[in-house]
Protein backbone atom coordinates (compact mmCIF):
# COMPACT_ATOMS: atom_id res chain seq x y z
CA UNK A 1 0.00 0.00 0.00
CA UNK A 2 1.40 3.36 -1.03
CA UNK A 3 2.96 5.66 1.52
CA UNK A 4 0.77 8.72 1.29
CA UNK A 5 2.70 11.73 2.56
CA UNK A 6 0.48 14.68 3.33
CA UNK A 7 -2.58 12.54 4.17
CA UNK A 8 -4.10 12.96 7.59
CA UNK A 9 -5.11 10.48 10.25
CA UNK A 10 -7.27 12.80 12.33
CA UNK A 11 -10.45 12.29 14.37
CA UNK A 12 -13.51 12.87 12.18
CA UNK A 13 -15.70 14.40 14.80
CA UNK A 14 -16.25 17.85 16.17
CA UNK A 15 -18.77 16.05 18.38
CA UNK A 16 -17.07 12.73 19.19
CA UNK A 17 -20.00 11.51 21.27
CA UNK A 18 -22.21 11.41 18.16
CA UNK A 19 -20.27 11.49 14.91
CA UNK A 20 -18.40 8.52 13.57
CA UNK A 21 -17.36 7.52 10.10
CA UNK A 22 -17.76 3.95 8.98
CA UNK A 23 -14.02 3.59 8.44
CA UNK A 24 -13.76 -0.15 7.98
CA UNK A 25 -11.59 -1.35 5.15
CA UNK A 26 -13.95 -0.79 2.23
CA UNK A 27 -11.50 -1.65 -0.55
CA UNK A 28 -12.78 -4.10 -3.13
CA UNK A 29 -9.64 -6.13 -3.72
CA UNK A 30 -11.20 -8.08 -6.60
CA UNK A 31 -11.92 -5.03 -8.75
CA UNK A 32 -9.00 -3.25 -10.39
CA UNK A 33 -8.46 -0.67 -13.11
CA UNK A 34 -5.00 -1.12 -14.51
CA UNK A 35 -2.77 -1.35 -11.44
CA UNK A 36 -5.21 0.62 -9.26
CA UNK A 37 -7.55 -0.86 -6.69
CA UNK A 38 -11.09 0.48 -7.06
CA UNK A 39 -12.46 1.65 -3.69
CA UNK A 40 -15.88 0.23 -2.95
CA UNK A 41 -18.73 2.75 -2.67
CA UNK A 42 -20.15 2.58 0.89
CA UNK A 43 -23.89 2.07 1.41
CA UNK A 44 -26.21 5.05 1.67
CA UNK A 45 -26.97 6.81 4.94
CA UNK A 46 -28.94 9.76 6.25
CA UNK A 47 -27.60 13.27 5.85
CA UNK A 48 -25.17 14.25 8.60
CA UNK A 49 -25.65 17.96 9.32
CA UNK A 50 -22.16 19.33 9.84
CA UNK A 51 -21.42 23.05 9.88
CA UNK A 52 -18.27 24.46 8.32
CA UNK A 53 -16.93 27.99 8.77
CA UNK A 54 -15.36 29.55 5.69
CA UNK A 55 -13.27 32.71 5.87
CA UNK A 56 -14.16 34.81 2.82
CA UNK A 57 -10.60 36.03 2.38
CA UNK A 58 -11.32 37.01 -1.23
CA UNK A 59 -14.12 39.36 -0.08
CA UNK A 60 -12.02 41.45 2.29
CA UNK A 61 -12.17 44.43 2.28
CA UNK A 62 -15.96 44.63 2.19
CA UNK A 63 -17.13 47.25 -0.30
CA UNK A 64 -20.81 46.25 -0.32
CA UNK A 65 -22.95 44.25 2.12
CA UNK A 66 -26.63 43.66 1.42
CA UNK A 67 -28.60 41.39 3.76
CA UNK A 68 -31.69 39.55 2.51
CA UNK A 69 -35.15 40.73 3.59
CA UNK A 70 -35.36 38.37 6.60
CA UNK A 71 -31.76 38.76 7.76
CA UNK A 72 -31.13 40.24 11.20
CA UNK A 73 -27.70 41.68 12.00
CA UNK A 74 -26.48 42.34 15.54
CA UNK A 75 -23.35 43.44 17.30
CA UNK A 76 -21.71 40.84 19.50
CA UNK A 77 -23.31 42.42 22.59
CA UNK A 78 -26.78 42.02 21.04
CA UNK A 79 -27.79 45.43 19.67
CA UNK A 80 -29.61 45.16 16.33
CA UNK A 81 -28.17 47.09 13.38
CA UNK A 82 -30.73 48.46 10.89
CA UNK A 83 -30.05 47.15 7.38
CA UNK A 84 -29.68 50.66 5.97
CA UNK A 85 -26.98 51.40 8.57
CA UNK A 86 -24.80 48.36 7.97
CA UNK A 87 -22.25 49.77 5.54
CA UNK A 88 -21.94 52.95 7.61
CA UNK A 89 -21.25 50.88 10.73
CA UNK A 90 -18.80 48.67 8.85
CA UNK A 91 -16.93 51.75 7.65
CA UNK A 92 -16.85 53.47 11.04
CA UNK A 93 -16.56 50.75 13.70
CA UNK A 94 -13.00 50.45 15.02
CA UNK A 95 -13.07 46.89 16.41
CA UNK A 96 -16.14 44.72 16.90
CA UNK A 97 -18.05 41.70 15.62
CA UNK A 98 -21.29 41.71 13.65
CA UNK A 99 -23.39 38.56 13.27
CA UNK A 100 -26.09 38.19 10.59
CA UNK A 101 -28.57 35.32 10.32
CA UNK A 102 -31.96 34.49 8.84
CA UNK A 103 -31.31 34.31 5.11
CA UNK A 104 -28.90 34.96 2.24
CA UNK A 105 -26.57 37.94 2.07
CA UNK A 106 -24.68 39.64 -0.73
CA UNK A 107 -21.06 40.52 0.02
CA UNK A 108 -19.44 42.66 -2.65
CA UNK A 109 -20.69 40.94 -5.84
CA UNK A 110 -21.37 37.44 -4.49
CA UNK A 111 -24.36 35.85 -2.74
CA UNK A 112 -23.96 33.47 0.19
CA UNK A 113 -26.28 31.15 2.10
CA UNK A 114 -25.74 30.61 5.81
CA UNK A 115 -25.00 32.74 8.83
CA UNK A 116 -22.35 35.42 8.36
CA UNK A 117 -20.03 36.91 10.97
CA UNK A 118 -18.06 40.06 10.24
CA UNK A 119 -14.83 40.10 12.23
CA UNK A 120 -12.72 43.21 12.70
CA UNK A 121 -9.15 42.98 13.87
CA UNK A 122 -6.32 45.37 13.21
CA UNK A 123 -7.02 45.48 9.47
CA UNK A 124 -10.08 45.16 7.26
CA UNK A 125 -13.31 43.39 8.17
CA UNK A 126 -13.27 39.68 7.36
CA UNK A 127 -16.57 37.95 6.54
CA UNK A 128 -16.90 34.37 7.81
CA UNK A 129 -19.84 32.29 6.57
CA UNK A 130 -21.14 29.27 8.51
CA UNK A 131 -23.07 26.78 6.40
CA UNK A 132 -23.90 23.10 5.95
CA UNK A 133 -21.00 20.99 4.70
CA UNK A 134 -22.94 19.61 1.72
CA UNK A 135 -24.02 23.11 0.64
CA UNK A 136 -20.38 24.13 0.82
CA UNK A 137 -19.23 21.14 -1.24
CA UNK A 138 -21.74 21.91 -4.02
CA UNK A 139 -20.30 25.41 -4.34
CA UNK A 140 -16.71 24.16 -4.35
CA UNK A 141 -17.44 21.60 -7.07
CA UNK A 142 -18.92 24.33 -9.29
CA UNK A 143 -16.00 26.67 -8.60
CA UNK A 144 -13.25 24.10 -9.12
CA UNK A 145 -14.59 22.35 -12.24
CA UNK A 146 -16.84 23.50 -15.10
CA UNK A 147 -20.38 22.17 -14.77
CA UNK A 148 -20.08 20.89 -18.34
CA UNK A 149 -17.63 18.23 -17.12
CA UNK A 150 -18.65 14.59 -17.06
CA UNK A 151 -20.87 13.69 -14.10
CA UNK A 152 -18.46 11.04 -12.79
CA UNK A 153 -15.59 13.53 -12.80
CA UNK A 154 -17.76 15.98 -10.87
CA UNK A 155 -18.60 13.25 -8.35
CA UNK A 156 -14.89 12.52 -7.88
CA UNK A 157 -14.37 16.24 -7.32
CA UNK A 158 -17.19 16.30 -4.75
CA UNK A 159 -15.59 13.49 -2.73
CA UNK A 160 -12.16 15.13 -2.91
CA UNK A 161 -13.60 18.52 -1.87
CA UNK A 162 -15.56 16.98 1.02
CA UNK A 163 -12.52 15.07 2.26
CA UNK A 164 -10.37 18.19 2.13
CA UNK A 165 -13.03 20.12 4.05
CA UNK A 166 -13.29 17.37 6.69
CA UNK A 167 -9.52 17.46 7.17
CA UNK A 168 -9.83 21.16 7.99
CA UNK A 169 -12.77 20.55 10.31
CA UNK A 170 -10.33 18.41 12.26
CA UNK A 171 -7.47 20.89 11.83
CA UNK A 172 -8.85 24.44 11.34
CA UNK A 173 -6.82 27.10 9.57
CA UNK A 174 -7.52 29.59 12.39
CA UNK A 175 -9.66 29.88 15.51
CA UNK A 176 -12.15 31.97 13.48
CA UNK A 177 -12.68 29.67 10.49
CA UNK A 178 -11.88 26.18 9.26
CA UNK A 179 -10.54 27.18 5.86
CA UNK A 180 -10.55 30.09 3.43
CA UNK A 181 -12.26 30.53 0.07
CA UNK A 182 -9.28 30.89 -2.28
CA UNK A 183 -6.91 28.52 -4.09
CA UNK A 184 -4.78 28.53 -0.95
CA UNK A 185 -7.44 26.06 0.26
CA UNK A 186 -10.16 25.28 -2.31
CA UNK A 187 -12.28 27.81 -4.16
CA UNK A 188 -15.68 28.64 -2.66
CA UNK A 189 -17.85 31.25 -4.39
CA UNK A 190 -21.20 30.80 -2.65
CA UNK A 191 -24.31 30.73 -4.80
CA UNK A 192 -22.41 32.01 -7.82
CA UNK A 193 -20.68 28.66 -8.35
CA UNK A 194 -23.54 26.39 -7.24
CA UNK A 195 -25.17 24.78 -10.28
CA UNK A 196 -27.61 21.92 -10.93
CA UNK A 197 -24.65 19.75 -11.98
CA UNK A 198 -22.61 20.54 -8.87
CA UNK A 199 -25.64 19.92 -6.64
CA UNK A 200 -26.27 16.58 -8.34
CA UNK A 201 -22.65 15.44 -7.93
CA UNK A 202 -22.76 16.43 -4.26
CA UNK A 203 -26.11 14.75 -3.64
CA UNK A 204 -25.08 11.50 -5.35
CA UNK A 205 -21.93 11.26 -3.20
CA UNK A 206 -23.50 12.62 -0.02
CA UNK A 207 -21.26 12.12 3.00
CA UNK A 208 -18.60 10.11 1.14
CA UNK A 209 -14.98 10.87 2.01
CA UNK A 210 -11.58 9.36 1.34
CA UNK A 211 -10.05 7.48 4.25
CA UNK A 212 -6.63 6.00 4.89
CA UNK A 213 -5.70 3.91 7.94
CA UNK A 214 -8.78 5.07 9.82
CA UNK A 215 -8.22 8.79 9.24
CA UNK A 216 -9.25 11.49 6.82
CA UNK A 217 -7.39 12.01 3.57
CA UNK A 218 -6.42 15.63 2.94
CA UNK A 219 -7.24 15.06 -0.71
CA UNK A 220 -5.12 17.44 -2.73
CA UNK A 221 -5.99 18.11 -6.36
CA UNK A 222 -5.08 20.47 -9.18
CA UNK A 223 -6.14 21.27 -12.73
CA UNK A 224 -3.60 19.03 -14.47
CA UNK A 225 -0.59 16.79 -13.94
CA UNK A 226 1.93 19.58 -14.55
CA UNK A 227 0.45 21.74 -11.80
CA UNK A 228 0.43 18.72 -9.48
CA UNK A 229 4.11 18.07 -10.17
CA UNK A 230 5.00 21.71 -9.53
CA UNK A 231 2.76 22.42 -6.53
CA UNK A 232 1.88 19.12 -4.86
CA UNK A 233 4.69 16.81 -5.87
CA UNK A 234 6.27 16.85 -2.44
CA UNK A 235 2.98 16.25 -0.62
CA UNK A 236 1.95 12.87 -1.94
CA UNK A 237 -0.82 11.79 -4.29
CA UNK A 238 -3.09 14.41 -5.90
CA UNK A 239 -5.94 14.28 -8.39
CA UNK A 240 -5.65 15.88 -11.81
CA UNK A 241 -9.02 17.44 -12.63
CA UNK A 242 -8.40 17.25 -16.37
CA UNK A 243 -7.23 13.67 -15.92
CA UNK A 244 -10.40 12.85 -13.98
CA UNK A 245 -12.42 14.23 -16.88
CA UNK A 246 -10.53 12.04 -19.36
CA UNK A 247 -11.00 8.93 -17.23
CA UNK A 248 -14.73 9.66 -16.90
CA UNK A 249 -15.04 9.84 -20.68
CA UNK A 250 -13.28 6.48 -20.86
CA UNK A 251 -16.13 5.05 -18.80
CA UNK A 252 -14.64 4.99 -15.30
CA UNK A 253 -17.03 5.70 -12.41
CA UNK A 254 -16.05 8.23 -9.76
CA UNK A 255 -14.74 5.64 -7.30
CA UNK A 256 -12.41 4.15 -9.93
CA UNK A 257 -11.19 7.64 -10.80
CA UNK A 258 -10.40 8.28 -7.14
CA UNK A 259 -8.64 4.92 -6.93
CA UNK A 260 -6.33 5.99 -9.74
CA UNK A 261 -5.20 9.12 -7.92
CA UNK A 262 -5.37 8.23 -4.21
CA UNK A 263 -3.76 4.80 -4.20
CA UNK A 264 -4.45 2.80 -1.08
CA UNK A 265 -7.35 4.93 0.12
CA UNK A 266 -10.83 3.61 0.81
CA UNK A 267 -14.20 5.35 0.67
CA UNK A 268 -16.23 5.86 3.84
CA UNK A 269 -19.51 7.62 4.50
CA UNK A 270 -20.15 9.96 7.42
CA UNK A 271 -22.82 8.62 9.77
CA UNK A 272 -24.24 9.41 13.20
CA UNK A 273 -23.26 7.07 15.99
CA UNK A 274 -25.91 6.87 18.73
CA UNK A 275 -24.60 6.26 22.22
Where are these regions (language model features)?
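Conserved, single-site charged/polar hotspot
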Residues: 1-275
Amino acid sequence: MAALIGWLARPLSQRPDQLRSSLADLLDHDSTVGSSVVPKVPPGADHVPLEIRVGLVSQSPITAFRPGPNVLCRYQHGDVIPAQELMKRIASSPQDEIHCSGGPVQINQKHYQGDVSLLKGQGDWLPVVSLDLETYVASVVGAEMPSSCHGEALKAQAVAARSYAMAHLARPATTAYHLGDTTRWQVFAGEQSTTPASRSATRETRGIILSYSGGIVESLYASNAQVIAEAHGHLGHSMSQSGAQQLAHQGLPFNAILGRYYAGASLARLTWHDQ
